[in-house]
Design a protein with these regions (language model features):
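N-terminal amphipathic/basic-hydrophobic helices that include classical n-h-c signal peptides
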Residues: 1-22, 243
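Asp-based, Mg2+/Mn2+-dependent phosphohydrolase catalytic module
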Residues: 17-30, 126, 142, 146-258
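Active-site neighborhood of HAD-like aspartate-dependent phosphohydrolases
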Residues: 24-68
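Conserved SAM-binding loop
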Residues: 39, 134-137, 169, 202
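Short beta->alpha linker loops
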Residues: 45, 70, 74, 116-120, ...
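An amphipathic alpha-helix signature
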Residues: 47, 51, 75-80, 103, ...
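A metal-dependent, Asp-based hydrolase signature
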Residues: 71-109, 119
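Short, acidic loop-to-helix structural element flanking the phosphoryl-transfer center
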Residues: 108-136, 142, 146
């Protein structure tokens, strides 16, 4: 995972992308993974850290509120929305204070116990990296994601990592997925054609993330690791976990109608 390349696509690339839909039927070429709740089993740790940081600042957050209202947002927008719901308008200083405390609490938690990767993650990504371009698009912080991957066999599987530091507007806005695809195309090898949105699969665990993936014109797989499956019905495919996800099932999405 190298430093991000922010240069806009060249005119030739834009022309190739514009012409590509007429040249072939879309087929799977890239897989973009959310991280928290999809790759790493750490949503509970994030909630506990948020809850404690807010409690120290005189605010209360229930598990039902967190999962029902705020999960899926990046940390910055989550805090802004939470304080807007509970306080008298925006308060950047308070947001920054709580954000720093939450990060400190989460770091301490993960130092004591590294959040595990979900079952099936290593198997799926090890196979997928041989055939497709892989990326992470997460509202989590880059340092936390890199720490969770460090020392695993998939640490270097992803061509691109987009995190909360890279995007001003979080999910359900599609900006994070559009930007991730732009980065993937900027890093393609010389012989590779640009990937179109219609050739991407997004793997998500949240309602907001599924909405973002669909708005980016990508296929979406919902994994019911965080929400019940019945909450994820806007995904093109809903499965209990990544253990149930195979490359054949992902490829089959491109032969089916929405």
């Amino acid at each position: 995972l190298d430093e991000q390349e922010r240069s806009p696509p060249c005119r030739l690339e834009s022309l190739m992308l514009e012409c590509a839909p007429s040249m072939s039927h879309p087929a799977l070429r890239a897989i973009i993974f959310d991280f928290n709740g999809v790759i790493a089993d750490d949503e509970t740790a994030h909630f506990i850290a948020f809850q404690e940081a807010l409690r120290e600042d005189g605010l209360h957050l229930t598990k039902e509120e967190y999962y029902g209202r705020y999960l899926g947002m990046d940390e910055r927008n989550c805090l802004a929305a939470l304080l807007a719901d509970r306080a008298d308008g925006p308060n950047p200083d308070r947001e920054q204070r709580i954000h720093k405390r939450k990060a400190s609490l989460f770091y301490a938690y993960t130092q004591r116990q590294t959040p595990p990767l979900f079952p099936g993650v290593i198997r799926l990504i090890t196979r997928a990296m041989q055939q497709y371009r892989l990326a992470i698009a997460s509202g989590g912080r880059r340092e936390q994601i890199l720490r969770a991957l460090r020392g695993t066999s998939i640490e270097h599987a992803f061509r691109v990592l987009v995190s909360a530091e890279d995007i001003a507007i979080g999910k359900p806005d599609p900006a994070i997925y559009r930007y991730t695809l732009e980065r993937l195309n900027a890093r393609r090898q010389q012989a590779e054609l640009p990937v179109r949105p219609q050739e991407c699969v997004v793997v998500e665990d949240s309602v907001a993330g599924i909405a973002a993936g669909r708005a980016a014109d990508m296929k979406v797989v919902g994994v019911a690791t965080t929400y019940p499956a019945e909450h994820l019905t806007r995904a093109h495919l809903v499965l209990p976990s990544l253990e149930e996800v195979s490359l054949d099932r992902l490829e089959a999405l491109f032969t089916e109608r929405d």
